[in-house]
Amino acid sequence: IGGAWLAANYGIESVMPLQTLSRIGSRRTTQVLDGITTEIYVESMRPTRTLRGHLTFHLKHEAPHLELLSMLFRKIDSIDLESWLADEPSGQYAKRAGFLYEFLTGKELAISAEITGAYIDVLDGLKLVVATPEHSIPNRRWRVRDNLPGTPNFCPIIRKNKDSIQAMSLDVSELINDLAIEFGDELLMRSEVWMTLRESKSSFAIEGEADQLDRIQRFANVLSRRTGQGSFPLNQAALSELQSEILGKRTTLEQFGIRQSPVFVGEVARYQDIVHYIAPPAADVHAMLEGVVTFLERTKGQSPVMRSAVAAFGFIYIHPLADGNGRVHRFLINDILRRDDAVKAPMILPISSLISSDPAERHMYDRILDEVSRPLMQSLAGLYEFEATYTTYADGIRSNFVFHGDDNARHTWRLLDLTKQVIYLAHLLARTIREDMREESLYIRSHAQARKAIKEIVEMPDIQIDRVIRSVESNQGKLSNMLSKEIPILQETFIWDAIVKAIENAFRDGPEMNVVSKYASRNRT
């Protein structure tokens, strides 16, 4: 019944699965299996076998599935809704259905009766993320409060269940404050440069480009200067500038900013093109990015975790650039958290570090991206091809990729269910702060203690102390010939042994990590 009946009766196969299945049984129960909730209702709850009956049930008892409704409204005869409205001009579910029809199709219904009754919210804020109350818009035509968080071109849904509510309640600033209490604000600020560089390096590592040192430094500079600054970086001018700074001059791109060519995510295996994801057509991108901005404007004051997830994952699924989408996607997480005051300047959370260094986390990240791409590509089988001839597009990109399924995919691209992405990002942020950043803070504290202890044994500049610490690590505590020649005083009786003991004591309670690799990374900055 409800959404499941509508899908079956009208032959609709949505890409985003129905997360709530309603059925009739002997008693009222709720069952949850593999993330799918099955609601069992008694016979008296069965709707009439009509569009009106089951659509009312869906809007009343289930979290509205906008992708399903978008596909449904293009299949039905509009007269079915118009007659419903004529019969119930003040009915709350008839009014909601009429508004959503026009919102999702862009078509206007012929209304024969005056719509009356009190103003009602279009979506139930207890079931879905909706616009903040002050950003809801009264609609006089339908006598509803438009509290959809986005636009017809981009209006993702985030379902409110136990896991997503917990994720959205994650207090990032409190987690960072806990670190500050343990290690002190000064130490956290001293680690900022390292964490920014680490985020940059790891962001390239995710894309298989970990050794691009000049590009890593350039992206680190972008993170430092641009995070949380100015207006949302989602229009042509801002994206063009951001992309050019990230990519630099050594690129084959002839034009920066929003692409004017088709794009897909894929690989070549044994001379065969494998397509993992197809992005929206270039003609749709501007309006979709405006939808992301609208979402951010209309959800002001709500969960920073939720808002950063929608901005970042919305961006990656829109894929508005010809190159650099992944780095901007991860940049947006820190950018929105900074704008929402969840992370204070100049701190950058090294989220990419955890993804790139932990194979299980990398698998989770890839899997969360596949939540949309895999079922979408299954639905688009046979609708794309690689032609023998190439086309040169307005942005200079040459491509022989041709996609024939824009109309099929728009329902999904525009109405993504990003609930799991929000849950994942909360998990990633919590691990980054509680584990990755804490480990880094422990290291910095131990390193400072080692420096201080060595200075009490023999005076030397910090740069030499750092070489000594690296040498102790790489040579298992033995004094190397090179270091003994560079710093002869280390050859004096007991000095080297005292230094080794001081370093061991400083790092005894710290993290088990490779000092050599840490310093190798730091010395490149």
Where are these regions (language model features)?
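FIC/Doc superfamily catalytic core
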Residues: I1-A322, R327-T525
